[in-house]
Amino acid sequence: MSHKAWQNAHAMYENDACAKALGIDIISMDEGFAVVTMTVTAQMLNGHQSCHGGQLFSLADTAFAYACNSQGLAAVASACTIDFLRPGFAGDTFTATAQVRHQGKQTGVYDIEIVNQQQKTVALFRGKSHRI
């Protein structure tokens, strides 16, 4: 694990009101890699009483943000897609793992997998980053 990646993540987390509000915690960091978790609360449920897709997107996007900023070079999302594969419910704990697939001078591609507490895949997210 990279000490620099952890420092960068903690510096970002200090200002990340969204991640804090969603109860997202950083579990692991390295260059181009991040693992974050979130427990689904009743406030995160949609009208079908399953986890709202926007909450899943936010979890994946947070892992993506920490991974693509792990080297200390500021980056933002330029495009993202997500595939929802199975529902989640109140009390479920989701883990999002982000891994770099390509990092050029300006643009990067990252894949994020969200799994539940049974290690079953809940969603797959791909993010494209741009360094600013």
PLM regions with names:
Residues 1-37, 41:
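Non-catalytic linker/capping segments at the edges of enzyme domains
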Residues 1-4, 88-90, 95, 101-132:
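HotDog/MaoC-like acyl-thioester-processing domains
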Residues 55-62, 80-86, 113-114, 127-130:
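Hydrophobic alpha-helical segments of small multi-pass membrane proteins
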Residues 20-22, 32-34, 76-80, 92-94, ...:
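A generic structural signal for short beta-strands and their flanking turns/coil linkers
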Residues 49, 72-73, 119:
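Detector for glycine-centered tight turns/loop "hinges" at secondary-structure junctions
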Residues 65-95, 100:
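Hydrophobic beta-strand-centered segment that forms part of the acyl-chain substrate-binding groove
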Residues 14, 19, 39-63:
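Hot-dog-fold acyl-thioester-processing enzymes
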